[in-house]
Amino acid sequence: MSDDGSIRPIEILLIEDDPGDVLLTTEAFQSSKITNVLRVVSDGADAIDHLRAQADAGTVPDLVLLDLNLPKVSGPEILEFIKTDPRLRRVPVVVLTTSAADEDIVRTYDRHANAYVTKPVDVDRFLDVVRQIDHFYLTVVQLPRSGDAAAGF
């Protein structure tokens, strides 16, 4: 809830450099039954700057969707940044990437990713996967409130 008692929208940060995947992910979250705000950052350096600024302001995202293959700073480096910053470490991070390589999967779970999902090639299947992430993280699980995660409780 927000300070005025109203339910605040769920804030999702999508870190993705492929415009087609951004469009499909946006479409899937727009059809969500839960009010959400989807912010998009398209390179790793901007993602770290954005996350740092949000943490400084005490308004961290409720969920991060992270591609591994990004320009400037890689997805695994961003994941490590998130999980080692006490203000961000409780934010769930779902890796959503084209790689199905075992070493990528192990490397991201070693860095404490909350889930690893290989992007389907089929558009309808991709939309379905994003909707399942939406359903699970926005309606099934309880997420720490943005302020609690940033405060490091």
Give residue ranges: language-model regions.
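Non-catalytic signal-transmission and effector/linker regions of two-component phosphorelay proteins
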Residues: 1-13, 19-39, 45-48, 52, ...
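Hydrophobic residue at a beta-alpha junction
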Residues: 42, 70-73, 82
